[in-house]
Structure formats: structure tokens, C-alpha cells
């Protein structure tokens, strides 16, 4: 299966929680609860709080391309970057040191590709060994983040890669209808921000589900939302997540930035 469905994720999460002896409760407050780990986990609710009050540096421990395609908003990446000579790149730990200017007491939260992903665990251990004193993990990772209603962000390099390699992706242009008619991105579909209302199954989102602009037969289709600016795109992306679309990202840039990213 190309995309991880919300049902599969929640079933997996419930099975893992049972395996590790956790009782049922508020799923947003749950953690994987593994034993033998030297770094604490944070729940989805706690991570949302961290991002809201910027009380920790959130690091995506995945390779750069995965980060560029889809990451939790506000997270940064410390993997090797194309074009950086090996003499200038030592390790993820060294990149963390550069990012934090050597301040090893800085609160850090790591995440990667879900419960079975070992990258955040390995990086956490390496950071502890390097003297970092406040390292935690969102071990549920980006699949559960999405399943619990979290939107993600896509970078220009990620947009370029997806456009070239995933022909099932739906681009959603949320600018004004007249702006869309005057020119948009290849195969984009128009859902103007002005028609996206609060609530579920209302306004232009409902109409888009009925008329085929949104892929109602497959809620796991990748949706990339592009607007006049980031705020406009994020608003609509969050509305689509509330409609049970499971793979929604908004573009981190303006419409002109998206055009530039997709320019041949």
C-alpha cells in the first residue's frame, strides 16, 4: 500500500500500546511506552504544546529528502545536505551542535518515521553521549501525527520531487478563482480560501468532494495545498485534514515560489 491509512495506524498504535502494557485513554496523550530507553517520549498533545510555545527545538531525524517532502511544521532537519562537502559535514550530532551553537542544555525533541523507526532513538543516544542533557522523542512519529489530524509542510525541493515522481498527487490552488483562471500550476484544482468555511462538509470543500476536485474515493491521496502565502495554504490544509484526508501538506512559500520550484 502506497500510503499509510489512518485506520491501519490507529490499529497498529493500539496493538503496540497493548503490547507495552498501556491502558486505553486519550490517544493524544499516549506514547509508545517502550522500556529500556534512556530518553523520555512525548505524546502528540505534548508535541503540539512544544510547537505552540516553542519550548524545545524539534528535529526531524529522517534524511533530507523525506523532510523536504513532508515534515511537521516548525521542525528542522540536520541530515547531510546536497552540495555540502564531506569536510564540512561530520554527523547529525555535529549539525545539532552548529544549530544550537553548542548549548547542550537546550531542550530537544526528535521524531522520525513512526514506532518502528530507529533513527530518532539512535540520534538520541548519540546526543546523550555528546553531552546533551534534555533530549526527548516523539516516537509515534509522522505517521501517527498525520493520523491524529496533524498537517505537514512541504519544501520547494520536496514539491519538485513529488511533481516528478508521484503522478497521483493532487495540487490544490487556494487563491482567488480569478487568479486561478489567469494561470495556475499544471493539473492544479481550484478551491479558493474564501469558500472554505468553519465546520465539516460545508462550503467549497463540500462542493469539491461532490464534483471530484477532491479525491473522495481515496482519502490517502497526497494533497499539496498552495496559496498566495503560507498562512492561506495552511488554513485550507488544516480544513482538509478535518475532512479525513490523511496525507495533506501545505507549501512552505508563496505561489510564485511554487511556480519557480516547478519551472522546467
Language model features with spans:
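N-terminal secretory signal peptides
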Residues: 37-59, 65-66
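Bacterial N-terminal signal peptides that target proteins for export
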Residues: 1-8
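Hydrophobic helical h-region of N-terminal Sec-dependent signal peptides
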Residues: 9-13
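Structural scaffold elements adjacent to functional motifs in cytosolic proteins
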Residues: 58-60, 171-173
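Beta->alpha turn/N-cap motifs
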Residues: 62-63, 251
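Rhodanese-like catalytic fold shared by cysteine-dependent sulfurtransferases
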Residues: 4, 15-42, 68-110, 114-170, ...
Amino acid at each position: 500500500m502506497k500510503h499509510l491509512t489512518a485506520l491501519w495506524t490507529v490499529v497498529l498504535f493500539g496493538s503496540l500500546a497493548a503490547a507495552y502494557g498501556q491502558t486505553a485513554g486519550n490517544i493524544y496523550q499516549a506514547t509508545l511506552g517502550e522500556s529500556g530507553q534512556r530518553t523520555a517520549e512525548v505524546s502528540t498533545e505534548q508535541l503540539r504544546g512544544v510547537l505552540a510555545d516553542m519550548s524545545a527545538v524539534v528535529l526531524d531525524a529522517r534524511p533530507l529528502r523525506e523532510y523536504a517532502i513532508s515534515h511537521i511544521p516548525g521542525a528542522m532537519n540536520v541530515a547531510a545536505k546536497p552540495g555540502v562537502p564531506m569536510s564540512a559535514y561530520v554527523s547529525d550530532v555535529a549539525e545539532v551542535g552548529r544549530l544550537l551553537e553548542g548549548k547542550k542544555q537546550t531542550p530537544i525533541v526528535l521524531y522520525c518515521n513512526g514506532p518502528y523507526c530507529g533513527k530518532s532513538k539512535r540520534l538520541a543516544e548519540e546526543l546523550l553521549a555528546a553531552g546533551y542533557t534534555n533530549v526527548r522523542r516523539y516516537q509515534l512519529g509522522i505517521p501517527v501525527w498525520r493520523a491524529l489530524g496533524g498537517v505537514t509542510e512541504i519544501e520547494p525541493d520536496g514539491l519538485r520531487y513529488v511533481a516528478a515522481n508521484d503522478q497521483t498527487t493532487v495540487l490544490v490552488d487556494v487563491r482567488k478563482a480569478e487568479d486561478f483562471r489567469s494561470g495556475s500550476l499544471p493539473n492544479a484544482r481550484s478551491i479558493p480560501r474564501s469558500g472554505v468555511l468553519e465546520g465539516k462538509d460545508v462550503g467549497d470543500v463540500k462542493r469539491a468532494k461532490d464534483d471530484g476536485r477532491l479525491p473522495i474515493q481515496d482519502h490517502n491521496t497526497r494533497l499539496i495545498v498552495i496559496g498566495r502565502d503560507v498562512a492561506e495554504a495552511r488554513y485550507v490544509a488544516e480544513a482538509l485534514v478535518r475532512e479525513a484526508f490523511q496525507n495533506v501538506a501545505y507549501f512552505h512559500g508563496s505561489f510564485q515560489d511554487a511556480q519557480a520550484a516547478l519551472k522546467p
